[in-house]
């Protein structure tokens, strides 16, 4: 577990996807989640302290060393600049294997949205639901939540002196949920709703949710107010 991690958010691409840069204050080791764009800006901030994050939680003064690149899922706005980050930091990439097929589609998908992206990255490492992986001496529980994509995951950062942090990708948003109608993604609305209820609702209510887009929220707030998860909304496949 980690005490008081420093978390910086960068909202990247025209889709304003949240890239999270998490630093262990005990050693400066750093993890990047969902490096979808603006890699030059993020690298400059990490390596040289030049520029600003879009928002920050906690504080850290010192040098950072990036030790892991991990992703909630493989849609292009979350993974499009992973090739640049992999090359710059000489690191392997972690992604659920059920999203491996999406890697090859990232460049084409981005082009349809008007983005110019490099050749797609290839993930060398994968994980399974319920595993706990240690990066930068910080523990992340892998919570597989298919429905937006086949391999979509939420990553729970376990914190020993405060609420945990859930990096939810496009599974859960403030007042909403991820789309299930995107092509070639394996979207399934009923499955997504079930995964949220079965795998996210049991988390502590003060768990801070970092969605892939939009403002932060908590598990408790979404359990009480998210209109897609109340008893009156059943969804359709």
Segments predicted by a language model, with ranges:
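Short Pro/Gly-enriched beta-strand edge/turn motifs at strand-loop
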Residues: 1-6, 111-115, 136-140
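Conserved beta-strand hairpin/beta-sheet module of binuclear metal-dependent hydrolase folds
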Residues: 2-51, 62, 155-169
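Conserved beta-strand segments of alpha/beta enzyme cores
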Residues: 6-8, 92, 125, 139-141, ...
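Short Gly/Pro-enriched turn/cap motifs at secondary-structure boundaries
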Residues: 10-12, 122-124, 144-148
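Short catalytic-loop micro-motif centered on adjacent basic/acidic residues
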Residues: 29-33, 68-71, 142-144
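Hydrophobic residues in well-ordered beta-strands that form the structural core
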Residues: 33, 94-95, 168, 211
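Active-site HxH/HxHxD metal-binding segment of metal-dependent hydrolases
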Residues: 38-41, 47-135, 163-164, 224-234
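Metallo-beta-lactamase
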Residues: 54-63, 109, 132, 138-144, ...
């Amino acid at each position: 577990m980690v005490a008081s991690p420093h978390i910086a958010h960068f909202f990247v691409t025209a889709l304003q996807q949240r890239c999270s840069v998490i630093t262990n204050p005990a050693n400066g080791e750093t993890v990047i989640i969902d490096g979808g764009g603006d890699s030059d800006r993020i690298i400059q901030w990490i390596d040289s302290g030049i520029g600003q994050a879009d928002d920050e939680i906690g504080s850290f003064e010192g040098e950072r060393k990036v030790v892991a690149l991990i992703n909630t899922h493989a849609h292009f706005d979350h993974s499009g600049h992973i090739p640049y980050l992999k090359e710059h930091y000489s690191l392997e990439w972690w992604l659920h294997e059920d999203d491996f097929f999406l890697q090859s589609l990232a460049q084409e998908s981005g082009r349809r949205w008007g983005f110019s992206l490099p050749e797609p990255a290839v993930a060398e490492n994968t994980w399974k639901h319920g595993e706990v992986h240690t990066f930068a001496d910080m523990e992340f529980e892998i919570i597989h939540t298919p429905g937006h994509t086949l391999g979509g995951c939420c990553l729970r950062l376990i914190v020993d002196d405060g609420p945990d942090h859930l990096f939810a990708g496009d599974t859960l948003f403030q007042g909403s949920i991820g789309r299930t109608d995107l092509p070639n993604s394996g979207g399934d609305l009923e499955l997504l709703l079930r995964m949220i209820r079965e795998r996210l609702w049991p988390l502590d209510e003060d768990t801070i949710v970092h969605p892939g887009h939009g403002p932060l929220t908590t598990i408790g707030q979404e359990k009480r107010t998210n209109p897609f998860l109340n008893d009156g909304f059943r969804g359709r496949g």
